[in-house]
């Protein structure tokens, strides 16, 4: 089973992934927790480039192809082998992030992005995509505070530095994607307490076990 988590910055993906992975392991499943970018050796290097505020001037198309390179290698090196071994793969961001951020956020052609995603993903499609839906203004406050506390504002804060309007477009993109594929997406309100959100996530994932 392949589960992906999507959402705007600060939507709580890391927290909910931790809880879901623990619940899956308690249910006797072997879990591969991973992320894009950064889920493989190449991805770690690309992540440092993509998220750093030092690369604020990165061209939108260059940004896109770095994400696609990460995805292609990550699928081949991590995701596909884990699925073949019968593991439950839980991934922080996947193809939908590219459409939401580089498409709706940056303004690149979404049809082109879907086609490029298909090449990079090589047929590996999530069984379930959990979209943690949150007002971007709230999410940015959370994410900025998190990075400040961790001392990662410069190293991992490039997207948090974008204007609120950018993140509003990203959210709208996610909602459009979810509306187009209701069978794959589970849209969960990320505003309530972490416990309440975790319960909602498990309510969806548990049905697929």
Curated annotation (Swiss-Prot):
GO terms for biological process: dTDP biosynthetic process; dTTP biosynthetic process; dUDP biosynthetic process. The keyword Transcription does not apply. Its EC number is 2.7.4.9. SUPFAM superfamilies: P-loop containing nucleoside triphosphate hydrolases. Pfam families: Thymidylate_kin (PF02223). ATP binds at residues 7-14. NCBIfam families: DTMP_kinase (TIGR00041). Belongs to the thymidylate kinase family. Phosphorylation of dTMP to form dTDP in both de novo and salvage pathways of dTTP synthesis. This is Thymidylate kinase. It comes from Solidesulfovibrio magneticus (strain ATCC 700980 / DSM 13731 / RS-1). The gene is tmk.
